Design a protein with these regions (language model features):
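Transmembrane helical segments that form the transport core of multi-pass membrane transport proteins
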Residues: 212-265, 269
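N-terminal signal-anchor module of multipass membrane proteins
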Residues: 1-90
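Membrane-helix interface and helix-disruption motif detector
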Residues: 51-59, 84, 97-111, 153-162, ...
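Cytoplasmic-side transmembrane-helix entry/capping segments in multi-pass membrane proteins
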Residues: 83-92, 131-142, 249-257, 297, ...
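Transmembrane alpha-helical segments of multi-pass membrane transport proteins and ion-pumping complexes
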Residues: 42-50, 54, 90-102, 116-125, ...
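Pore- and pathway-forming membrane helices of multi-pass small-molecule/ion transporters and channels
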Residues: 42-47, 59-77, 114-152, 167, ...
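Intrinsically disordered, low-complexity non-transmembrane regions of multi-pass membrane transporters
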Residues: 1-35, 178-201, 342-354
Length: 354
């Protein structure tokens, strides 16, 4: 394996190489490559998002985050169908992520929920056909981030331009990387494979319904940062109930641990570098191969931003309450939903929770 190929490995792959190292020299080499990868990734992410902030305004830095997520995921991941059709779907997904979250914010919570259901139905049914690829962690997360950080007026006009640029970049990279691959299925096959008795379709419907309902309830209860509850719900909804239970436990424990760690750092560090706690969390995520640890470090970035608006106590209370509500509601919703949905004997779609 070349140096460049090793840089392309995910956290689990890099850690597996470290574990299998037979000599200290080999282990030190793999550790060095791993550290270079983390540093290069962080530097690139910081540079990329900063460019979007400069071009389209600080209030649209979240656009840089969403575009970056899509670029990093879809340079490797696919939609399981013909490359040309997949590219057109990606362009459609960007239109949906640009328009629907903004419109939903203009409506009442209930009407917004209905629009969110319709938007997520397209994203999930056509973009998340293979649960093992976790495309929902990109598409639905991107949608929720844009929903939570909505803008108006001139800022929204700049967001339109930023998302158009992001769509062009993502579609270009996706098509270039996948054009030589052969796919036997097309868009029509995705529609024909919709089956409410299959574990995949039930999982998709759960995502489509549960996440907008969580957002709606949080907003009706006047809970700030409703997107946190939606993101928490999205992240734990899986085809396997066993995996769901695992993620619910890890999400709750991870967020509480993250809150404690953030609070300690908040009091130990000078106020001038509070913003860098989020970057520290990003580095931690880079070293984390397991969901539980990712939940811990993801908390840093969210709290670093929220603490500026709500103060430390308010941000911590919101983070814990929104996450516990989101994952517990999602688990209860899916248990009831799966219970009432028709069943058939089939080979279950398996998605590991790690």
């Amino acid at each position: 394996m070349t140096f460049y190929q090793e840089l392309q490995l995910n956290q689990a792959g890099s850690k597996n190489l470290l574990k299998k190292s037979k000599t200290l020299k080999e282990k030190l080499y793999h550790m060095w490559v791993y550290l270079v990868k983390i540093a290069a990734t962080m530097a690139f992410c910081f540079f990329f998002v900063s460019i979007f902030s400069i071009l389209f305004g600080n209030e649209n830095s979240i656009v840089g985050v969403v575009v970056l997520l899509c670029l990093m995921v879809f340079r490797n991941a696919d939609l399981g169908i013909h490359t040309g059709q997949s590219t057109m779907l990606l362009a459609l997904f960007f239109v949906i992520m640009t328009v629907c979250p903004h419109l939903a914010n203009q409506f009442s919570p209930v009407l917004g929920m209905l629009l969110n259901i319709a938007a997520l139905a397209v994203l999930i049914l056509f973009g998340c056909h293979n649960p093992s690829m976790f495309n929902q962690s990109t598409l639905v997360l991107g949608y929720l981030l844009l929903y939570g950080y909505d803008v108006t007026g001139k800022s929204y006009q700049m967001r339109l331009v930023g998302m158009a640029l992001g769509a062009a970049l993502t579609c270009f990279v996706f098509y270039r990387n996948h054009k030589n691959r052969t796919y036997k299925r097309n868009l029509k096959d995705l529609i024909q494979e919709f089956d409410i008795t299959s574990s995949r379709t039930k999982w998709q419907i759960c995502q489509i319904l549960c996440v907008p309902i969580v957002l709606c309830i949080a907003e009706l209860c006047n809970m700030p940062r409703a997107m946190w509850a939606g993101i928490a719900a999205m992240s734990v909804i899986l085809p396997s109930m066993e995996d769901m239970h695992y993620r619910v436990r890890k999400r709750i424990v991870g967020n509480i641990a993250g809150v404690i760690c953030f609070t300690v750092l908040y009091f130990l560090l000078p106020s001038s570098i509070y913003a860098y706690i989020g970057i520290l969390g990003g580095i931690g995520v880079g070293f984390s191969a397991q969901y539980g640890w990712q939940a811990v470090f993801n908390t840093f970035g969210a709290l670093a931003i929220a603490a500026e608006t709500y103060g430390l106590q308010g941000a911590v209370s919101l983070r814990v309450s929104q996450n516990v509500f989101g994952v517990v509601f999602a688990l209860a919703f899916c248990v009831i939903f799966y219970w009432f949905m028709p069943k058939k004997k089939e080979s279950e779609v398996t998605v590991h929770a790690e």
